[in-house]
């Protein structure tokens, strides 16, 4: 007898003790989600891409300077000519374009007196009709900046939705954990009921039907316990995904009793919702985009008329210094114009822009009404959840008292176990209903904050 005991003790010593699962609070999960949520990381990458693209577009309005070197050899005389210099241009945001070029040419071995020559050209172009509106020239820069702003709002929207997602998943897991605890208690009571019913059946005070009823109740409780356990693991996986946690990380949670912000009054929440919801602000800016599109389309319908101011000079000499000195400068001014005979494409572009503007304005009005309706719907659900919780709490107390009375009567032999099973099922349903309504209040308050645009991220991240 001693050897098996020693062997069992040795096995217990050799088995490593698993460390306790860490407890992740809602604040810790939210902070992890803000840093590692895959969907949020994707939109952050899109924001960085938009910022880089904006820098690229802005660089097109900076001076563009390109040095060059070229060599050419004549086929007839086999004489080589070297040319080097630079070209420069700059497009100003108000539409003016400046182009310049400076070239120095050298003919090695040329017997002429001046083997070096230079050429200078500076051209200033100003649109006078088509494209004279500065909005035409600045449109690429404006669109790039709008893309950055739009992506910033997308990030803010997804951050708020991530808070909602984490809370829904976290509270869902907390609900299933509590349901699992209730199912375990119910299973334990059902097991005791089955044992007591069998004992009374053997004593002859109960029928076989009572034993079968108790066994069925025990099986039902075990099924509920199994379902709750599986739901806990499913929601644990969802929480891992939402927070960017490791797929095998084991953890426990602590259900929050409150949320860090208080929802405003319904009237206050509906007032000014368009100024607080990023979706509404973005829709308003899309109207501005369409207005710019119409403005540009009208400008492009005008005939092309450009004023051109040109400065030219040349130089020559026996050395580089002499050749670089400009001689015979000329200054000329002229007009350049063109207009296509088929203006249908430009007309169609203007009409498309005008129709798109009407659509954006109509959609914004619908969005305004939808956001107000969303606020009202969220507050109705909060009122309903609060009312349901009051009823569910009272119902749970009555159901508990009924179950206790039925159990007491059964233990004293005053009744069979039918009333016990019935009262037990009612009590279990009442407790789950009270649990659901309690969690529904927290989720409804979050929906009120989100719908009113008052869901601020920092207070949620500062939770312990």
Go through each PLM region and give its residues:
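Acidic, low-complexity, intrinsically disordered peripheral segments
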Residues: 11-18, 247, 259-267, 313, ...
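Bacterial N-terminal signal peptides
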Residues: 1-5
